[in-house]
């Protein structure tokens, strides 16, 4: 498992039972996971990323993936 995958799974565990969400960002230093705040009115069923997080992730580098969890489901990376 990569460091990025480990960070994604750790974030999903911290957010449960709500959905986690974030971006995988490619920077000059390498790939990294950028966790975002789920601002959905129903975070246990849906996700909505905070616009500020989206902007900060974009400023870090190239967004190469959008990631979110399905609480109660199996991880699929």
Question: Predicted segments — roles?
Answer:
Residues 1-63, 72-77:
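Conserved beta-strand-loop surface patch within small alpha/beta domains used
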